[in-house]
Curated annotation (Swiss-Prot):
UniProt entry tagged with the keyword Cell membrane: yes
The protein, known as: Multidrug resistance protein MdtB
Sample GO molecular function, one term: xenobiotic transmembrane transporter activity
Principal subcellular localization: membrane
Gene3D superfamilies to which the protein is assigned, alphabetical: Multidrug efflux transporter AcrB pore domain (3.30.70.1440), Multidrug efflux transporter AcrB pore domain like (3.30.70.1320), Multidrug efflux transporter AcrB TolC docking domain, DN and DC subdomains (3.30.2090.10), Multidrug efflux transporter AcrB transmembrane domain (1.20.1640.10)
Region forming the signal peptide: none
Record's subunit section: Part of a tripartite efflux system composed of MdtA, MdtB and MdtC. MdtB forms a heteromultimer with MdtC.
Keyword terms, alphabetized: Cell inner membrane, Cell membrane, Membrane, Transmembrane, Transmembrane helix, Transport
Recorded topology in the membrane: Multi-pass membrane protein
Family (UniProt): Belongs to the resistance-nodulation-cell division (RND) (TC 2.A.6) family. MdtB subfamily.
Keyword Cell membrane among record annotations: yes
Length: 1040
């Protein structure tokens, strides 16, 4: 048994050093738990931080935006506004469609929100129009969230109406049942229907009206209960031929008698099988298609959901005819998986670089193996905790583990270096392990808890940004904590068994060359440090200048919210003049699609024209452009967008707005551009006065580009001004007028055909082919009191006016949203400030309010809390260090290193042309935890030298700096190399990772050079200050 020297108790590590088998088994258990946990971790792009969001869609074909607002949207809004936990309610009322989007507080479960929405819809039912074709339909989905998967269904042999019927009954329903799917929408609008196109002249010639025809059809097609007969022995169910299923049956329907002769529907109308809405269409790569957009529920796992759909697709497509082709046009999980793979590669590269730097410094294979074991053990063990906390493998958690690579190795390096130093002095390995581990134990605890303290403020960040980085902070904190445990248990135990004087002294030519190099570097550092200590005020001036420079750089650096990712999918809106018809929009989309598909980076394209729950107005076309994989194209997404907009710019009468899809979706409405600013008033008249003024002012700002608004009040409208007195004299009511107009021009759904698989509509309208435009109104006839027919022109005057194409509300009040992008050379912070200055210049009245929306609002909130976040991190670390050192002074000395990290990070971001965004700020906060390690290692040894060896403060700090120079350099380089793969990343999702790497590498480079000299000087300054205070207040000294 070895005789241990006095003081070599080993501290908390003693038990683990002396019991190697128990220590090994304990570490094996941590490793096994991590491996098992990894298999159960889901994969995602980012942590699940979606607001609980529900979309309520109500379709009322033929209704104007005014009618939709007053008759549908307003009653629903009044009921929704009473729900608890509602964060924001926005609505959009357009011709025939009302879409209300409800965003709830993050703390409210989605299922609870769903129950409240259903109850509110039920309460509003009696207030909605009685002839509403379908009740409001709600979906647990955020409309601004891009589809997780887009599929196109095409056929060269079958009409699109049959294709849609098959897709709706055989495919869409099954996909909707997949766990995690929130909504499956079919773009293209080709639901089968029987269309009845009345010949107005033929109807009038027979003395009939459209209302006569409608009544006849609705009475002839019914499907109601008829009862049953219950006899003494048998029961008989009653049924009848009350249903008409085909266009031929409707064509033969007798609608009236003239002079004893039957008038059949086919005599006055064209009856045919067609689509329910003839003003809807979708195309995939210019071919007519039914496009299925699959959106996930907020909070659902996107990878698991997409995998379930793909597993189901072969079975579903087998049930379709051979001529029907189903193509997956886009799958967001492809890029998510690629991004996660790239991040995993960078994690492995970081581990390899860190192990390499360890070997370079230690030049000993056994000594390199020890931290080489500690790093993967700490990282893998973290997976077990992540499973317990319901985390996922995503870009942020993998970034945390990549950064943790440099952190977790620090503890092991510090322990190994200290134990090796005693072995090289002649101590036995076991005694050296006990003594070295006991001596360094407090330093490891200080490093660990002070670093975790930096992360604590991240856990208390509010709103969606706080939720986003909670997984990052907790994952990193867990890895650091496990690393500390490993460094105080397994590392010293392995040192006691694997290190020896022979192994440490065994050197080859490379080792000796490295040793000579390190000796020269340390000697040079010692000479430089001696000069610096002799000129403290010059050094303090440099430290103070660094502080001022960090503040200046913070003010001038461009600031942003979240890096714009290249996910390979572009969402777009094609805008045309407000009076554009469906036919003209279909022609325009063909021209635009042709230009877009010619671009070498484009893989596929889907376009949609018409009004439904996804598209609000007829003069806009929705596009989704799917790009080739990143390694198969030369340009990033922003370059492709610029090229496409240039190509389309020469097409007259259209404006194309494009933006790349992002993994983080904060908006609740589909926007034309990345950022939004809203103008809200109590009335539409107030908005109409101020919107043009503000839009002109915003368009003149150089900090903004592609400025547009959703205010569209120049749509053509025909105002039917009825002479109520004349109408009353003829026995014609306003309801008669509305019904006649609705029958003629509203694609009115007048009856339902029920089948075993689905339900289909009978659509009534006038055949306006021979009388287009306003002339069609002259064909309208109404039934008077005496049974005769009266032309509409006899009781009404037709006026052409302008009317809004859509009416938007936010929390029940009218609102207009301005969309904008930020041009190259400016930051989002510049744009926000320019908008605020413009608002002040315009001097808006008190009843007009403005607000940033979506990601711009989140940016404002994040920017406002950033300074407080950093202050909170510093205060938290000061408190922890003060408790550990039982001193008010030493924590200040340690924290004095922070400005150097800030200067380095900000300079690196500016040089790299990167904005100070949320990711970069997280990097700066992490630097706070890393950089202070240097000071802790210096001060710990200086205090020990003063206390145990009686050295003067100057000699103690000088010796501590030289003794700890090598581990400081080693740990800093390890952290730097851990961040280097992130800084140099170029794969999918690199935009997200790069700012963190740039900030950390820049901060570490600058701080490493400066803190090695400024920390000793500041230590001595505060020591003299402490002596001065004690001399002026001797009572404190006596009490001490």
């Amino acid at each position: 048994m070895q005789v241990l020297p006095p003081g070599s108790t080993g501290g908390p590590s003693r038990l683990f050093i002396l019991r190697p088998v128990a220590t090994t088994l304990l570490m094996a258990a941590i490793l096994l738990a991590g491996i098992i946990g990894y298999r159960f971790l889901p994969v995602a792009a980012l942590p699940e931080v979606d607001y609980p969001t529900i979309q309520v869609v109500t379709l009322y074909p033929g209704a104007s935006p005014d009618v939709m607002t007053s008759a549908v949207t307003a009653p629903l809004e009044r009921q929704f506004g009473q729900m608890s936990g509602l964060k924001q309610m926005s609505s959009q009322s357009s011709g025939g469609a009302s879409v209300v989007t409800l965003q709830f507080q993050l703390t409210l479960p989605l299922d609870v929100a769903e129950q409240e929405v259903q109850a509110a819809i039920n309460a509003a039912t009696n207030l909605l129009p009685s002839d509403l074709p379908n009740p409001p339909i709600y979906s647990k989905v955020n409309p601004a969230d891009p589809p997780i998967m887009t599929l196109a269904v095409t056929s060269n042999a079958m009409p699109m109406t049959q294709v849609e019927d098959m897709v709706e009954t055989r495919v869409a329903q099954k996909i909707s049942q997949v766990s995690g799917v929130g909504l499956v929408t079919l773009a293209g609008g080709q639901r089968p229907a029987v269309r009845v196109k009345l010949n107005a002249q033929a109807v009038a010639a027979l003395g009939l009206t459209s209302e006569t025809v409608r009544t006849a059809i609705t009475g002839a097609n019914v499907n109601s209960a008829k009862g049953s007969l219950d006899g003494p022995e048998r029961a008989v169910t009653l049924s009848a031929n009350d249903q008409m299923q085909s266009a031929d049956e409707y064509r033969r329907l007798i609608i009236a008698y003239q002079n004893g002769a039957p008038v059949r529907l086919g005599d006055v109308a064209t009856v045919e099988q067609g689509a329910e809405n003839s003003w809807l269409g979708a195309w995939a790569n210019q071919a007519p298609a039914i496009v299925m957009n699959v959106q996930r529920q907020p909070g659902a796992n996107i990878i698991a959901t997409a995998d379930s759909i793909r597993q189901m697709l072969p079975q579903l497509t087998e049930s379709l005819p051979k001529s029907v082709k189903v193509t997956v046009l886009s799958d967001r999980t492809t890029n998510i998986r690629a991004s996660v793979r790239d991040t995993q590669f960078e994690l492995m590269l970081a581990i390899a670089l860190v192990v390499m730097i360890i070997y370079l410094f230690l030049r000993n294979i056994p000594a390199t193996i020890i931290p080489g074991v500690a790093v993967p053990l700490s990282l893998i063990g973290t997976f077990a905790v992540m499973v317990f906390l319901d985390f996922s493998i995503n870009n942020l958690t993998l970034m945390a583990l990549t950064i943790a690579t440099g952190f977790v190795v620090d503890d092991a390096i510090v322990v190994i270096e200290n134990i090796s130093r005693y072995i090289e002095k002649g101590e036995k390995p076991l005694a050296a392990a006990l003594k070295g581990a006991g001596e360094i134990g407090f330093t490891i605890i200080s490093l660990t808890f002070s670093l975790i303290a930096v992360l604590i403020p991240l856990l208390f960040m509010g709103d969606i940004v706080g939720r986003l980085f909670r997984e990052f902070a907790v994952t990193l904190a867990v890895a650091i904590l496990i690393s500390a445990v490993v460094s105080l248990t397994l590392t010293p135990m392995m040192c006691a068994r694997m290190l020896s004087q022979q192994s440490l002294r065994k050197q080859n030519r490379f080792s000796r060359a490295c040793e000579r190099m390190f000796d020269r570097v340390i000697a040079s550092y010692g000479r430089g440090l001696a000069k610096v200590l002799n000129h403290p005020w010059l050094t303090l001036s440099v430290a103070f200048a660094t502080l001022l420079l960090s503040v200046m750089l913070w003010i001038v650096i461009p600031k942003g919210f979240f890096p714009v990712q290249d996910n390979g999918i572009i969402q777009g809106t094609l805008q045309a003049p407000q009076s554009s018809s469906y036919a003209s929009m279909a022609q325009r989309q063909r021209q635009v699609a042709e230009r877009i598909l010619q671009d070498p980076a484009v893989q596929s394209l889907t376009t949609f024209v018409g009004v439904d729950g996804a598209n609000s107005t007829l003069n806009s076309t929705r596009l989704q452009i799917n790009l080739k994989p990143l390694d198969a194209r030369d340009d990033r997404v922003q370059q492709v967008i610029s090229r496409l907009q240039t190509a389309v710019a020469t097409i007259p009468g259209v404006a194309l707005y494009l933006q790349p899809t992002q993994d983080l979706t904060i908006d609740t409405q589909v926007s034309r551009t990345q950022y939004q600013f809203s103008l809200q008033a109590t009335t539409l008249d107030a908005l109409s006065h101020w919107v043009p003024k503000l839009q002109n002012a915003l368009q003149s700002l150089p900090q903004l580009s592609e400025v547009s608004s959703d205010w569209q009040d120049r749509g053509l409208a025909a105002w039917v001004n009825v002479d109520r007195d004349s109408a009353s004299r003829l026995g014609i009511s306003m309801a008669d007028v509305d019904n006649a107009l609705y029958n003629a021009f509203g694609q009115r759904l007048i009856s339902t055909i029920y089948t075993q698989a689905n339900q289909y509509r009978v659509v009534l309208e006038h055949n306006t082919a021979s009388t287009p435009g306003l002339a069609a109104l002259e064909t309208i006839r109404l039934t008077s009191r005496d049974g005769g027919t009266v032309p509409l022109s006899a009781i009404a005057r037709i006026e052409q006016r302008f009317a809004p194409l859509s009416i938007n509300h936010l929390d029940q009040f009218p609102i207009t949203t301005f969309s904008f992008n930020v041009p190259e050379g400016y930051s989002l912070d510049d744009a926000v400030q320019a908008i605020l200055d413009t608002e002040k210049t315009l001097a808006l009245p008190a009843d007009i309010t403005t607000q940033f929306q979506g990601s711009t609002l989140a940016f404002q909130a994040a920017l406002g809390s950033t300074v407080w976040l950093i202050v909170a991190a510093v205060v938290a670390m000061y408190i922890v260090l003060g408790v550990l050192y039982e001193s008010f002074i030493h924590p200040i000395t340690i924290l004095s290193t922070l400005p150097t990290a800030g200067v380095g990070a900000l300079l690196a971001l500016i040089i790299a042309g990167s904005e100070l965004d949320i990711i970069a700020i997280i990097g700066i906060i992490l630097l706070i935890g890393i950089v202070k390690k240097n000071a802790i290692m210096m001060i710990d040894f200086a205090l020990a030298a003063e206390r145990e060896q009686g050295m003067s403060p100057r000699d103690a700090i000088f010796q501590a700096c030289l003794l700890r120079f090598r581990p400081i350099l080693m740990t800093t380089l390890a952290a730097l190399l851990g961040a280097l793969p992130l800084m140099l990343s170029t794969g999918v999702g690199a935009e997200l990772r790069r700012p963190l790497g740039i900030a950390m590498v820049g901060g570490l480079l600058v701080s490493q050079v400066l803190t090695l000299f400024t920390t000793p000087v500041i230590y001595l300054l505060f020591d003299r200050l402490s002596l001065y205070v004690k001399s002026r207040f001797p009572r404190h000294k006596e009490e001490a």
